[in-house]
């Protein structure tokens, strides 16, 4: 891995981590196009953990004041994190074994179909909530503890590579009655405890790999910095986008990317 690859992959991570399109799938595709293989590539594995931290710090920076001002919101995030934390801890090894391009491809396509179906369903069943005039990211203050827990359960689906953490939580957020913007904002926030925990657990479990790759720390820091800047821009742009457009475009995009995987990566 070189500086150019670190920058490109940092951009891909920042662009896709919080969009419902599977950052894992795009990282595999990006690495493939750069001529990098995940098989036996310890440097790439460590790099991907590092740049995830850059992305999650963007959420922390964006919502820091909000979290400090609303302790109840922190409590809801903890409740939402509990299912994922427990299942992730118990099934860590099995989850890692699920990682393969074929699983990612099919998860992308299935997730795309689900997004389109849920969007169309909500237009019929709850048109007021799903209208473009409804909701804002301030809606997260009204989310109940029950809704937080249910959305947290949905986050467990993201342990299947290619499903997309944000995709699964946004879909269930919509089904729980949240607006497009409210579902997205809570999904972003729920990433804080989830991704921090996953990142530090990965570092702990693979500490020997990180120590052996200490010579590449400058690449890890560069990629994380790029991911942070790009993710900060994407978070704001995405909330603005979904206040004007539906999630159907993301569903279609997922299906296309899944098909690309089946044709060119497998």
Name the predicted role of every residue range.
Residues 1-266:
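Multi-pass membrane proteins that catalyze or facilitate reactions on polyprenyl-/lipid-phosphate substrates
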């Amino acid at each position: 891995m070189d500086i150019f690859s670190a920058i490109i992959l940092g951009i891909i991570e920042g662009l896709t981590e919080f969009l419902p399109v599977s950052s894992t799938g795009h990282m595999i595709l990006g690495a493939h196009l750069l001529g990098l293989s995940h098989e036996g590539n310890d440097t790439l594995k460590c790099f991907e953990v590092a740049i995830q931290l850059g992305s999650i710090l963007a959420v922390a920076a964006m919502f820091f004041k909000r979290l400090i001002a609303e302790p109840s919101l922190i409590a809801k995030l903890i409740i939402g994190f509990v299912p994922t934390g427990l299942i992730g801890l118990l099934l860590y090894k099995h989850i890692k074994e699920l990682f393969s391009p074929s699983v990612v491809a099919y998860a992308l396509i299935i997730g795309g179909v689900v997004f389109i179906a849920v969007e169309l369903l909500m237009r019929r069943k709850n048109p007021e909530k799903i209208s473009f005039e409804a909701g804002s990211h301030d809606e997260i203050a009204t989310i109940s503890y029950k809704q937080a827990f249910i959305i947290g359960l949905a986050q467990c689906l993201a342990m299947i590579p290619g499903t997309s953490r944000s995709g699964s939580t946004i879909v269930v957020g919509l089904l729980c009655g949240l607006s497009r913007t409210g579902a997205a904002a809570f999904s972003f926030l729920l990433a804080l405890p989830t991704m921090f925990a996953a990142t530090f657990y990965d570092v702990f479990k693979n500490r020997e790999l990180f120590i052996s790759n200490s010579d590449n720390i400058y690449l890890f820091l560069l990629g994380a910095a790029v991911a942070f800047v790009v993710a900060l821009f994407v978070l704001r742009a995405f909330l603005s986008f979904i206040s004007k457009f539906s999630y159907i475009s993301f569903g279609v995009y997922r299906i296309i990317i899944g098909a690309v995987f089946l044709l060119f990566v497998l």
